[in-house]
Regions:
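N-terminal transmembrane alpha-helices
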Residues: 5-42, 56-71, 75, 100-107, ...
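Short runs within selected transmembrane alpha-helices of multi-pass transporters and secretion channels
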Residues: 69, 138-156, 164-172, 193-206, ...
């Protein structure tokens, strides 16, 4: 259902629009962890490692595709705000064609390079076969995974964040049920997890298409599917920098994981657990980024620039409030949180140190996440790409390496490096915002 996000209370809009985002992201994260949990219950280390490594590769591919799709979300949102029905439908049509072609190309390339990918990930010898089979099935299913994410991006551009939440709930339900059937009953190991993932995404797409047809949400004719240079350019101008940024962030996570792995199995385990915890805590700023992008895109379309800045301000306050709460809470109960995931005292000790430092990132990241969403709505997603690259190259990766060498007995300094990177990103974002505002770049 199309919704006008430029009317009513700006605060109420951002809360009601971001909440389904948050729930959808939570389900998506839970969905990813379900595979690991169920495989771990029924199979050995080789299968678990295969799914873990394979899902990491698939997550990188997915976030990069979703990053490009953000271009569609923003452009559709603008045309909704401008009341340009023809351009809106053409953007939807072009999005469908572009990503159909892109998903097929990506699938063929990944299948061709599957063995080098498994090798680059430093896959243990025992897990190579399981990882390869898992990735092969998931790569074949990329068109379905892409279709789900594209449909969700279109709905969000139309101002509907609830429907994508329902779609991911469908995928989550089928994934868990199929995992128990394929892995628990048929003992299919990592292959079962892969089939469960692909089939559940397909079921989600079928439900989404059924909803679109039944409710007549998007009426597309053949001429809307004709590729238009300007529309394609606009989508990639916004989406490509986000895609590259998200891909680079995932690469930095892999590098930091490699650094942690070099410090021994206990530290590697501690860092792995904390990364999972942080992924949950970051659902709030991540959801706020997406919500601000969609809402502000409609505001740009109606030239309600003051309302767009008001949305940014409310988003920052909400995300910052949650970030401060998480940061303070984890300083006092970090060991208790770690004990939910492991009973090994040494892992809890290292994990507690790492979490106390890392959780501060929730405070500062909440600022630059919100600004990134705002910049994206105005078509300046390149700013988000630049500040993230600077942060990763200058602080996050070298900081993790240097602190691992200077402080071998503790993980606290290594945990602080992401927060330091986010402080730099926040400073860059605020500075650029002030400069661009003075030049009336947000009032055209």
């Amino acid at each position: 259902m199309q919704k006008d996000l430029t009317k009513g209370s700006a605060l109420k809009n951002i809360i009601t629009f971001s909440l389904p985002f948050l729930l959808a992201n939570f389900l998506q994260t839970f969905y990813g962890m379900a595979d690991l949990f169920i495989v771990g219950q029924y199979n050995g280390a080789a299968s678990l490692s295969g799914v873990s490594i394979g899902s990491q590769v698939m997550h990188m591919i997915t976030v990069m595709l979703v990053g490009i799709a953000m271009g569609s979300t923003v452009m559709i949102g603008r045309y909704v705000g401008e009341r340009k029905e023809k351009e809106k439908r053409m953007t939807v049509g072009n999005t469908i064609i572009i990503f159909m072609i892109l998903s097929l190309i990506v699938t063929l390339i990944l299948l061709f390079f599957i063995n080098p990918i498994v090798s680059i990930m430093s896959t243990p010898v025992e897990a190579i076969q399981e990882t390869t089979l898992y990735l092969k099935i998931c790569f074949i299913g990329i068109p379905f995974i892409t279709a789900y994410n594209i449909i969700s991006s279109i709905f969000r551009g139309l101002g509907d964040s609830k429907s994508p939440m329902y779609f991911v709930a469908v995928a989550c339900f089928f994934n868990i049920v199929l995992d128990f059937i394929f892995i628990g009953y048929f003992n299919m190991h990592a292959v079962g997890a892969a089939f469960g993932t692909v089939i559940s995404q397909l079921m989600s797409v079928i439900v989404a298409l059924f909803a679109i047809i039944k409710r007549k949400l998007i009426v597309i004719h053949r001429y809307h599917l004709k590729l238009h240079k300007k529309i394609i350019k606009d989508i990639f101008k916004i989406g490509f920098p986000i895609s590259m940024q998200d891909g680079l962030i995932q690469v930095s996570f892999i590098i930091i994981t490699i650094i942690a792995n070099s410090r021994g199995v206990d530290i590697a385990a501690a860092v792995g657990v904390v990364e999972k915890i942080i992924s949950f805590l970051f659902l709030v700023p991540s959801s706020m980024l997406s919500a601000i992008s969609a809402i502000c895109a409609q505001c740009v379309g109606t030239k309600q620039h003051q309302r767009a800045r008001q949305t940014l301000r409310y988003g920052c306050f909400i995300a910052l409030g949650f970030g401060i709460f998480f940061a303070l809470t984890c300083q006092f109960i970090s060991k208790e949180i770690l004990s939910l995931f492991t009973s090994e005292a040494i892992v809890i000790m290292y994990g507690s140190q790492y979490l106390k430092g890392y959780v501060l990132d929730c405070v500062f990241a909440s600022i630059h996440f919100c600004f990134s969403g705002f910049f994206t709505a105005y078509g300046y997603s390149i700013i988000s790409f630049i500040h993230n690259v600077i942060s990763i190259v200058l602080i996050r990766v070298p900081g993790a390496y240097i602190t691992s060498k200077l402080f071998p007995e503790t993980l606290l300094p290594m945990g602080l490096t992401p927060a330091l990177g986010s402080i730099l990103s926040a400073m860059i974002c605020v500075s650029i915002f002030i400069i661009m505002k003075k030049k009336n770049k947000f009032d055209y």
